[in-house]
UniProtKB/Swiss-Prot annotation:
InterPro entries: SecB, SecB-like_sf. Homotetramer, a dimer of dimers. One homotetramer interacts with 1 SecA dimer. GO terms for biological process: protein folding; protein tetramerization; protein transport. This is Protein-export protein SecB. GO terms for molecular function: unfolded protein binding. One of the proteins required for the normal export of preproteins out of the cell cytoplasm. It is a molecular chaperone that binds to a subset of precursor proteins, maintaining them in a translocation-competent state. It also specifically binds to its receptor SecA. The lineage of its organism: Bacteria, Pseudomonadati, Pseudomonadota, Gammaproteobacteria, Lysobacterales.
């Protein structure tokens, strides 16, 4: 278990324990559901078309703490009309102590979103069902593949900063 300091930052690891990856907190940062054409949309006999948009944001909170936000927007079109738009921003605070920058980058880009994704999947499904629509289950996402693609793009752009390079957030 890691200790937490009074400002929310993860306490440095004891030299005897070595590197550590911890989940400090998981929370919903933002959630929205809109069904602009309800209730008439329920009578439409059109095959719905779904569009999924996925985004990840990383913010350094302190020397060893990072916030990772997994944002998912699912839009369902029924012909020319929008059946619903479900948006979820699921976040977590992760402690990464005693790791090199490359390992931190890999964990932020792969393991953190893998930890957050089941929460996103459940919340999206619950929102859609509560809106009166048939259940929809997000299929697994290959975050390792997405991370590899991001690395490739960074290399093409001349080594853009890694996820771990973000500056600590200031107090607003």
């Amino acid at each position: 278990m890691s200790e937490e300091t009074t400002n929310g930052a993860v306490a440095p690891a004891d030299a005897a324990t070595g590197p550590a990856f911890t989940v400090e907190k998981i929370y919903v940062k933002d959630v929205s559901f809109e069904s602009p054409n309800a209730p008439t949309i329920f009578n439409d006999q059109v095959q719905p078309e779904l569009q999924l948009n996925l985004n990840q944001q990383v913010q350094r909170l302190g020397e060893n703490a990072f916030e990772v936000v997994l944002a998912v927007t699912l839009t369902c079109q029924a012909g020319e009309r929008t059946a619903y738009v479900a948006e979820v921003k699921q976040a977590g605070v992760f402690g990464l102590v005693g790791l090199d920058p490359q390992s931190i980058d890999v964990l932020l880009g792969t393991q953190c979103p893998n930890i957050l994704f089941p929460y996103v999947r459940q919340l999206i499904s619950d929102l859609i069902q509560a809106g009166g629509f048939p259940p929809f289950f997000l299929q697994p996402i290959n975050f390792e593949g997405l991370y590899a693609e991001t690395l490739r793009q960074r290399q093409e752009q001349g080594d853009a900063p890694s996820l771990a390079d973000s500056e600590p957030a200031g107090n607003a």
